[in-house]
């Protein structure tokens, strides 16, 4: 499962946690690397190219949850 697929399982109209917030932001970003399973690629994208801001420390926590899923 890609990180994008993992995030899409957390989409919701009401943001209840960091994963939901990131999922909602990523869903609206057509350039997000949807096929990636690579931490560095996704982290770099969020840091340098994403059209939104998301705290990278929070991203790290969501990534750890992804790895445990």
From Swiss-Prot:
What InterPro entries does the database record attribute to this sequence? UPF0346, YozE_SAM-like, YozE_SAM-like_sf
Family membership noted in the UniProt record: Belongs to the UPF0346 family.
Q: What is this protein called?
A: UPF0346 protein llmg_2280
Q: Which domain of life does the UniProt lineage start with?
A: Bacteria
* Species, as recorded: Lactococcus lactis subsp. cremoris (strain MG1363)
NCBIfam families tied to this protein? PRK13672.1 (NF010193)
Residue ranges crossing the lipid bilayer per the database entry: none
